């Protein structure tokens, strides 16, 4: 089997696993989010470094849910130089509190955190503070990986230990999945692919709930299709109290 074919096989296995074994957790996450939205609350997404790609993928996206509010920090994104700064800052205790304080979060809101290892301080801080403020916390993490490592937060918690709903991405420790004879480390991570599938699956489950409740479904249209800009502008206006990125 070629390396590329092995990677493809690992991806399909991971997607099948999360679809079959994490369906209840995905449904639980969707129910929490949909309920929050119908109650007038807000949903926030966070991830540091590559984990933050999932928030970017779900946010302001054609065919995507309009009420996802990302929590971005330039110092935790991959366009910062030196890029190693992201690793240092996601381990800095107290930084997650600052980031959450930058948003108008309130009781009943939902915070979705993507962290593969679930060990770093920024995600732990954010989860702890969210819980203190009465928010629901949902995490997407690698349980096998996270259970093998210690927390980098003074509380000793890992992310899955603080979350109301835990979705396991089914990955391997270290995220990469393809073994190479000449290398000591594996190659080709899968968390981004699995994460994208997961967040959009949550949206699809939410839509089923909205359909059953008979409520409107705030989904973006492509801005590159005629009429898309006008339609999206109407969403911004209608849901301005739940949209915090404009």
Curated annotation (Swiss-Prot):
NCBIfam families named among the record's database cross-references: PRK02947.1 (NF002805)
Gene3D superfamilies given in the database record: Glucose-6-phosphate isomerase like protein, domain 1
Database matches in SUPFAM superfamilies: SIS domain
GO-annotated molecular function: carbohydrate derivative binding
Ranges of residues in domain SIS: 33-212
One record GO biological process: carbohydrate derivative metabolic process
InterPro entries in alphabetical order: RpiR-like_SIS (IPR035472), SIS_dom (IPR001347), SIS_dom_sf (IPR046348), SIS_GmhA/DiaA_subfam (IPR050099), UPF0309 (IPR022951)
Organism: Oceanobacillus iheyensis (strain DSM 14371 / CIP 107618 / JCM 11309 / KCTC 3954 / HTE831)
PANTHER family hit by this protein: PHOSPHOHEPTOSE ISOMERASE (PTHR30390:SF7), SEDOHEPTULOSE 7-PHOSPHATE ISOMERASE / DNAA INITIATOR-ASSOCIATING FACTOR FOR REPLICATION INITIATION (PTHR30390)
Family the entry assigns: Belongs to the UPF0309 family.
Protein's name in the database: UPF0309 protein OB3413
